[in-house]
Structures are given as structure tokens and as C-alpha cells.
């Protein structure tokens, strides 16, 4: 079976092709036959496509800013050129999509029907940076005649957080508002779930025995408290804007600020939304960049706003982590993942320093090496700290495999 995975971001498209054989999933993560990444931010009205097969890498400039055309060109590299891995796109058995927001109706991998596609569209106001990109991928696949009848499966970021108890999931607002679907949905669920399971595997312990917090820290960032193997609290909420200070997102702020800006500055909801999601966080405070590496470099050069941005970033990270520890009523395992979480030793050290009173003790040498899928806490630490490399694409492929074996084969017969 060949599964194509599309993982769309607000300004990128990451894709890979897995070949899975037999009646069981492999014990180790297989190397994809093909990987591709489109970056829409590098060139104006163009995209930069990077394709890798069997260790060979090629870069293609897409002479279009049209996402569907770009995805079609990306898929063309599967079957054309010296590094083609398929004779025809018809060899693809299933296409899996990461979808950020699934609302209250989707708790597992779901066959994308017109009704599901419309539901994803209806949730665009709650995930304006992501759900449109997911729809572009779905529509691009549907537009290809050779793939038009191939099952497309949605794997929702929100699904893992369906287990959050009502007191943590609902907001202290009138019930009439709650009845509108206003609640904590949580995001990065595919990553949090994968990293939790991988942590249990690394430690050789049942996941249900761990009081675990997973820290998915990239340009977007969230923490999740996991107890008895399920999510019981998370920092993102109704939208991916709540919680931690992020690269360009503000994270949690006093909602009265928005009313103040509307009343005194005449800002529209759209203007406020854009500012909070794309012009705040590290970028907004520093005035320089949403990239933590740039902030750290500027901080080292004495830039005061970069220094302030970093200190705020760490302060809010610590505060949110304390909140998750309280929800767990303790902590025995802490996991860092994603771009910043896996690579920024300084962030890990500065965050963990505040929790030494819990007996948490990093091993400085291990932490500075940023090893993958490894414990980085000291041997006498009361809290085990790990770096786990998140594998969202493989996690999506696993969910698609389970769907295929539980439902897909019946639908094909």
C-alpha cells in the first residue's frame, strides 16, 4: 500500500509518500519513498519546492503563487524525472491530510466526504491560517482525474484533546455562548499524541503510568498535560492563538484589550485578528523577527527589545508549564519537541531552571548536545526530561493505516 501524506501549513506544504506492506505496522519508522516541501514565503508570488528521494535532493522554483497548481507540480515529481518513484499516480492507495481544526464532531481519522469538506470550511474562522490550506490540498487531489476516486482521510489536530474534562474544556462564560461551540479544542494533537507514545516506548513504561507534559515548541507552540494516557489539559484553546507567547502570535492576553483597541483606535476585528496572529509574539515585541534564532542573535548583540522578547517568552512558557503541572497534580516526565523544543538548548535550560524546586535537574552536557529521542535530565533528577523528535507525518500515516484496515478495505470490496 502506498500512502501519500499532505501536511499543510499557513505558508508551506510538507508531503511524503510511505509504502506499507503486511498486516502490521513496522516497529521502526520507515523512510519515506519521497519527501517534498513547498515554501511560499521565500519568493513573491512564487514557491520554492524541495524534493528528496533516496538521499537525492532537488530544488524547483514554482513560477506561480497558486497553491493548487503548486501542489500539482509537486505531485508531478513523483512520476517524472530521474528521481521518479512511481510509474503513475494511480499507484497511490490513499491520501492522508493533517487538518488543524475538526470542531466537536471528529475524534478520529475520517473519510473526507463533501459534508466533511464543508465542515472543514465552516471552521475556517477558528483556524484562518490553516484550514484554508488544508482545503487547497484536498481540492488539488480531487482535481487530478487519476486520484479523484482515491480515499482522502482527514486526521484532526483537535481529536487527541477530546478527552479534556469539562471543567478544563469549557470557559467561564454564559451557557448560551458555550452552546455556540465556544470551548477549548486544543491543537498540535497529532504531535502531542505521537510524542507521548514515543516517550513511553523510550522509557519502557506504560503510557498510562506517566504524569507527562509534552511541549510542542515551534513557531506555533502548545503544552499538553497527559494523564492515564490521555490529554487532560492543554494551553491552546478555542483557536491556536491562546496560551504561550509564540513566534508571531500573542498567546493569551486580557480580552478587554481588544475592546479598548476597537473603541479608541477604531480597529476592525479583521485588523486585530491579523495583528494578534501574524504581528505579535516574538516578532511584535522585538520588532525584528518571529524566528527565535534571530532573536537570540540580536539579544547576544545587545538589542534590548530582543532581550525583552526572550525574557517574556521564557516567563510565559514557565507560567503555562506551571499551569499544566497543577492540572496533573504532579509531574514525572517532561518532553520537548518541534523546531525550538528539539534544538534550542538555551530555552530548555531557562525553562527547566524554574522547576528545580520539584527536583528537576537537567544534565547540561546532554542538553547542549540536543540529542534526538533521548533523556537529557540528570540521573538523580526526580523529573525525567526528554527530547523527542516529532513525526507528525508518520503519525498521520499510522492513523490512515488503521482507518484502511478497519474501514477502507470494506469500502473497497
Swiss-Prot record:
Keywords: ATP-binding, Cytoplasm, Kinase, Magnesium, Metal-binding, Nucleotide-binding, Transferase. The lineage of its organism: Bacteria, Bacillati, Cyanobacteriota, Cyanophyceae, Synechococcales. It catalyses: acetate + ATP = acetyl phosphate + ADP. NCBIfam families: ackA. The gene is ackA. This is Acetate kinase. CDD domains: ASKHA_NBD_AcK_PK (cd24010). Pathway: Metabolic intermediate biosynthesis; acetyl-CoA biosynthesis; acetyl-CoA from acetate: step 1/2. Its cofactor is Mg(2+); Mn(2+). It comes from Synechocystis sp. (strain ATCC 27184 / PCC 6803 / Kazusa).
